[in-house]
């Protein structure tokens, strides 16, 4: 899969996030969206620091991910 596209989520979707290759190689993280809240923020996933999750809404998650796409921090997102 090539290219970058805006994600479209429904509550309960399982989202696979694949990050750009960095100094320490490529990392893959899984993010489960459910109950209109998500388990980990993108910053937590990116740094590997899984802390108490923020109570953000599904639309907040979409905005955060879109910002990371726009800033080039996410190469692509695949829903499955």
For each predicted feature, which ranges?
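Mixed-charge, Lys/Arg-rich low-complexity intrinsically disordered regions
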Residues: 1-11
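Short, charged beta-turn/beta-strand-edge "cap" motif at the junction between a beta-strand
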Residues: 20-24
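Short aromatic-glycine-enriched beta-strand elements
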Residues: 39-41
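Intrinsically disordered, low-complexity, charged/polar segments
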Residues: 45-80
